């Protein structure tokens, strides 16, 4: 393990919620919850003001609404988050070529590799500068952890939250870890935590004391060894610039279980098309088609089929997914469907029949305006005006949807650079009101946030699991 | 029953008949081989409800009769026997095999429970064994191997008067072979989809005979069956249901370029560069006037490049293929010179054989191969 705290972990503070607060002045200092707003939606992120009420991410939306009834509930604007994330990642890449993004709002950076820092002092300087730069470019805050290993850097950034910087000086790691609860360590969730507690182990220090053999006896070989090493603050995992994408998949949770077999088939076809679009967008193809079905009773099945050659042909994926669906009993109804492609490659074996048929339909069918999650909404109006999304009024200018229903839509006219704006209500079909692209959070930065997006993003009730392999960078794995 | 038969004759017949014995018999009697002795002939039959096989050999019959014994065991025994006449006799529920100083006593299975073998459909025509075997070999190579689309695991046999067309595809290539035969009825017209694997085994087994009889039931009795007979062996196979997709329109008729390459050096070169093409990653072919450059591998891993002489008429082209599919085709054309015709790098290429560089392509066999599209 290195001797200087030159691994940096950046974690943006309440990222989605902070973006919303930055772009909507009326929400600053208020409880904001971003996530799927359907009956089966979950919280993606909530602002610190909302956390006071006990709301946290991954909580069912209904529970969040009970805990914080007066918070603002918004549908995520992924295009905007993605573009801001790109600005942040660009800043990180200026620091070092070794940047390992974990999600839109989190990444590891190896400062040593870029020559940005060699010791504790320069590392702290780099971290402080990064936080200032992020603030200037995006207007948002991020917390930075600095340590000699990935695990500790992440623990440090957790301790730094919100809007802080924590550096763990090498040599002090074990003393710092010792009193911490075992749940601090990555890989220790509720189950392992309970297991250890029953064995009388509640702190990291106690893991170290228990010894490796005891850990292996309790948790098995792989987990036991790994956990013991971590308790001694030993973590040799390097920062890896581009993690290989291993699969591409999409899934939807439905507000109401689908019973109709034909409808299930239609949804699977639609998911297959969406999955192929993602696959193509990253220049990939794959050999194995995976279908995931969660039934009314939460029993979850996955079925897969491997083709002889990799494909990115929507017809082939749709066909394979349909064949896989044939082998699944859906009589009780399904609450979730997913289609994925793995065994990725960067070439495609053309298919005679699909090409012959595909001369009719080269591209995957365009996503229809109605998304499954919203298909059950009482009126088509609500589909067009998702809460939190941007709109433009010919006279009143830029604003965002505060809510809609009963044929009306309420818009607050404000921009990231204005003061708190006024609220006006319109008929949902008011011709002067159109969906708009998000505005950049900071008026004068080059590129990024203001890039055009294709109107309001349609979203399923729960967040789509986009990249099973993490990263998101267009990486390739060769089978 | 009591018979005497030459050891080699017996061993060969048993081995062939036992090949279609089911590995996991659905009923115990189906693990048996039915031996029937009558009129100077010993016939051996096996059946697994899909395929039936029957072979007749000359034997000295002392007492006619029928017996059902474990096929695997009889195959193992007859293979291991010394080269002396073999005597098989039955006594109640036991069968005895005596050869030289060895003596085996086998349990018999109940003959009356053994299903009747399907009737051989009426003979419809004959074809020389060699022609049939090579045609099947050329076509079956392109058949699908997994059961996701059962239709694609078959070889389509289409009979139109005196011409027979075999076709099969796994959706990545499409092989078609035509040959002439002697039909009983010159106006015959029939189509059958035969499991490729069975057809390959059958064709191989029947090469020894001069002529192979193809028996395909048009309608009525024996429908859904095809029979083959030659060299004292006859076998029937259940047909697959369904038909291959229409393929005439899949074969392009106009090309932008035609390449002519000597097959042997081409095959050698593909095999060599494919060494770095792990898991059938593509081999890339770039044709320019007078030369073909083959490449495989990627800059992350190993790479290989090789040049081969080639004649090209038309536009230069770069195209990539799964090396296995390409090699399958090159071996199937069975010609000293290969002709590859292209439209574009994403459209199917047509492979056929030429007897010599300056000869016309042999129209009897066509191998359509889908390219691999490289992204980026």
UniProtKB/Swiss-Prot annotation, chain A:
Which residues are annotated as site, described as Substrate discrimination?
Answer: 16
Provide the protein's localization.
Cytoplasm
What Gene Ontology terms for biological process does this UniProt record contain? DNA-templated DNA replication; error-prone translesion synthesis; SOS response
Q: Name one GO molecular function term.
A: magnesium ion binding
User: Keywords of this protein's UniProt record, alphabetized?
Assistant: Cytoplasm, DNA damage, DNA repair, DNA replication, DNA-binding, DNA-directed DNA polymerase, Magnesium, Metal-binding, Mutator protein, Nucleotidyltransferase, Transferase
What Gene Ontology cellular component terms go with this record? cytoplasm
Q: Does the keyword Cytoplasm apply?
A: yes
Catalytic residue list:
106
Q: Which cofactor does it need?
A: Mg(2+)
Concerning PANTHER family, the annotation shows: DNA POLYMERASE KAPPA, DNA REPAIR POLYMERASE UMUC / TRANSFERASE FAMILY MEMBER
Q: What does this protein do?
A: Poorly processive, error-prone DNA polymerase involved in untargeted mutagenesis. Copies undamaged DNA at stalled replication forks, which arise in vivo from mismatched or misaligned primer ends. These misaligned primers can be extended by PolIV. Exhibits no 3'-5' exonuclease (proofreading) activity. May be involved in translesional synthesis, in conjunction with the beta clamp from PolIII.
Belongs to which family?
Belongs to the DNA polymerase type-Y family.
According to UniProt, the name of this protein is DNA polymerase IV
- Species for this entry: Streptomyces coelicolor (strain ATCC BAA-471 / A3(2) / M145)
Curated annotation (Swiss-Prot), chain B:
Q: Sorted alphabetically, which Gene3D superfamilies does this protein's record hold?
A: DNA Polymerase III, subunit A, domain 2
Disulfide bonds, paired cysteine numbers: none
Keywords (alphabetical) are:
Cytoplasm, DNA replication, DNA-binding, DNA-directed DNA polymerase, Nucleotidyltransferase, Transferase
What InterPro entries does the entry give?
DNA_clamp_sf, DNA_polIII_beta, DNA_polIII_beta_C, DNA_polIII_beta_cen, DNA_polIII_beta_N
Q: Which SUPFAM superfamilies match?
A: DNA clamp
Query: Which cellular compartments is it found in?
Result: Cytoplasm
Gene Ontology terms: biological process: DNA strand elongation involved in DNA replication
List the record's Gene Ontology CC terms alphabetically.
cytoplasm; DNA polymerase III complex
- Matching SMART domains, A to Z? POL3Bc
Keyword Mitochondrion annotated: no
For molecular function, the Gene Ontology terms on record are:
3'-5' exonuclease activity; DNA binding; DNA-directed DNA polymerase activity
Q: Which family does the entry's similarity section mention?
A: Belongs to the beta sliding clamp family.
**Subunit architecture:** Forms a ring-shaped head-to-tail homodimer around DNA which binds and tethers DNA polymerases and other proteins to the DNA. The DNA replisome complex has a single clamp-loading complex (3 tau and 1 each of delta, delta', psi and chi subunits) which binds 3 Pol III cores (1 core on the leading strand and 2 on the lagging strand) each with a beta sliding clamp dimer. Additional proteins in the replisome are other copies of gamma, psi and chi, Ssb, DNA helicase and RNA primase.
Its biological purpose is as follows:
Confers DNA tethering and processivity to DNA polymerases and other proteins. Acts as a clamp, forming a ring around DNA (a reaction catalyzed by the clamp-loading complex) which diffuses in an ATP-independent manner freely and bidirectionally along dsDNA. Initially characterized for its ability to contact the catalytic subunit of DNA polymerase III (Pol III), a complex, multichain enzyme responsible for most of the replicative synthesis in bacteria; Pol III exhibits 3'-5' exonuclease proofreading activity.
The protein's name is Beta sliding clamp
Q: Please report the organism this UniProt entry assigns to the protein.
A: Streptomyces coelicolor (strain ATCC BAA-471 / A3(2) / M145)
């Amino acid at each position: 393990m290195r001797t200087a705290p030159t691994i940096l972990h950046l974690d943006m503070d309440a990222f989605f919620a902070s973006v919303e607060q930055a772009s909507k002045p009326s929400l600053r200092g208020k409880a904001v919850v971003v996530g799927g707003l359907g009956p089966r939606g979950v919280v993606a992120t909530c602002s610190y003001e909302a956390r006071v009420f006990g709301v946290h991410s991954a909580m069912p939306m209904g529970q969040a609404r009970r805990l914080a009834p007066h918070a603002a509930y918004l549908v995520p604007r992924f295009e905007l988050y993605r573009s801001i994330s790109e600005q942040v990642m660009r800043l990180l890449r200026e620091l070092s070529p070794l940047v390992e993004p974990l999600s839109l709002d989190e990444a590891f950076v190896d400062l040593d590799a870029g020559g940005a820092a060699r010791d504790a002092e320069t590392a702290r300087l780099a971290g402080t500068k990064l936080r200032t730069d992020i603030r200037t470019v995006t207007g948002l805050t991020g917390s930075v952890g600095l340590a000699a290993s990935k695990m500790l850097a992440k623990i440090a950034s957790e301790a730094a939250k919100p809007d802080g910087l924590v550096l763990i000086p090498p040599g002090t790691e074990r003393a710092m870890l010792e009193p911490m609860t075992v749940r601090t360590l990555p890989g220790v969730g509720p189950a392992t935590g309970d297991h250890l507690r029953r064995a009388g182990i509640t702190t990291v220090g106690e893991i170290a004391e228990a010894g490796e053999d005891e850990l292996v006896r309790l948790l098995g070989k792989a987990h036991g060894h790994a956990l013991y090493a971590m308790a001694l603050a030993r973590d040799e995992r390097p920062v890896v610039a581009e993690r290989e994408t291993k699969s591409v998949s999409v899934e939807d949770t439905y507000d109401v279980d689908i019973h109709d077999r034909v409808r299930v088939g239609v949804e699977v076809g639609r998911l297959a098309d969406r999955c192929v679009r993602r696959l193509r967008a990253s220049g990939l193809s794959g050999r194995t088609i995976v279908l995931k079905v969660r039934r009314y009773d939460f029993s979850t099945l996955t079925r897969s089929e491997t083709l002889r050659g990799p494909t990115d042909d929507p017809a082939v994926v749709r066909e394979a997914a349909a064949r896989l669906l044939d082998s699944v009993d859906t009589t009780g109804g399904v609450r979730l469907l997913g289609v994925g492609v793995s065994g990725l490659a960067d070439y495609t074996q053309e298919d005679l029949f699909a090409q012959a048929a595909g001369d009719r339909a080269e591209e995957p069918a365009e996503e229809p305006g109605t998304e499954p999650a919203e298909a059950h909404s009482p009126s088509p109006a609500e589909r067009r005006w998702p809460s939190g999304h941007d709109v433009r009024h010919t006279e009143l200018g830029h604003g965002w949807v505060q809510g809609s229903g009963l044929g009306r839509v309420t818009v607050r006219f404000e921009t990231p650079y204005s003061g708190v704006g006024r609220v006006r209500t319109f008929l949902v079909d008011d011709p002067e009101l159109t969906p708009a692209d998000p505005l950049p959070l900071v008026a004068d930065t080059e590129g990024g946030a203001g890039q055009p997006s294709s109107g309001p993003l349609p979203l399923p009730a729960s967040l789509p699991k986009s990249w099973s392999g993490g990263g998101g960078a267009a990486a390739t794995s060769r089978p | 029953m009591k018979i005497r038969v030459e050891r080699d004759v017996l061993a060969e017949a048993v081995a062939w008949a036992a090949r279609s014995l089911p590995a996991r018999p659905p009923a115990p009697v189906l693990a048996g081989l039915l031996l029937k002795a009558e009129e100077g002939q010993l016939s051996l039959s096996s059946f697994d409800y899909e395929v039936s096989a029957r072979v007749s050999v000359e034997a000295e019959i002392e007492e006619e009769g029928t017996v059902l014994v474990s096929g695997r065991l009889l195959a193992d025994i007859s293979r291991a026997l010394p080269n002396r006449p073999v005597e098989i006799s039955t006594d109640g529920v036991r069968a005895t095999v005596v050869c030289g100083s060895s003596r085996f006593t086998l349990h018999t299975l109940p003959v009356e429970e053994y299903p009747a073998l399907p009737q051989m459909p009426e003979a419809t025509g004959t074809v020389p064994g060699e022609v049939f075997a090579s045609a099947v070999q050329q076509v079956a190579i392109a058949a699908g191997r997994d059961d996701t689309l059962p239709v694609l695991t078959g070889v389509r046999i289409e009979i139109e008067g005196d011409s027979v067309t075999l076709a099969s595809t796994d959706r990545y290539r499409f092989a078609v072979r035509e040959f002439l035969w002697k039909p009983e009825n010159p106006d015959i017209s029939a189509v059958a989809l035969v499991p490729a694997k069975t057809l390959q085994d059958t064709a191989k087994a029947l090469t020894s005979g001069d002529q192979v009889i193809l028996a395909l039931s048009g309608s009525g009795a024996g429908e859904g069956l095809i029979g083959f007979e030659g060299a004292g062996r006859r076998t029937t196979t259940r047909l697959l249901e369904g038909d291959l997709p229409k393929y005439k329109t899949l074969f392009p008729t106009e090309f932008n370029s035609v390449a002519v390459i000597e097959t042997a050096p081409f095959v050698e070169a593909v095999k060599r560069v494919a060494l770095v093409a792990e898991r059938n990653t593509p081999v890339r072919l770039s044709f320019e006037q007078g030369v073909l450059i083959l490449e495989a591998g990627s800059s992350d891993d190993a790479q290989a490049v090789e040049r081969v002489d080639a004649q090209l008429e038309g536009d230069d082209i770069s195209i990539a293929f799964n090396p296995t599919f390409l090699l399958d085709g090159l071996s199937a054309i069975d010609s000293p010179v290969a002709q590859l015709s292209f439209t574009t790098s994403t459209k199917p290429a047509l492979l056929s054989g030429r007897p010599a560089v300056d000869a016309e392509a042999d129209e009897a066999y066509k191998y359509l191969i889908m390219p691999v599209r490289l992204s980026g």
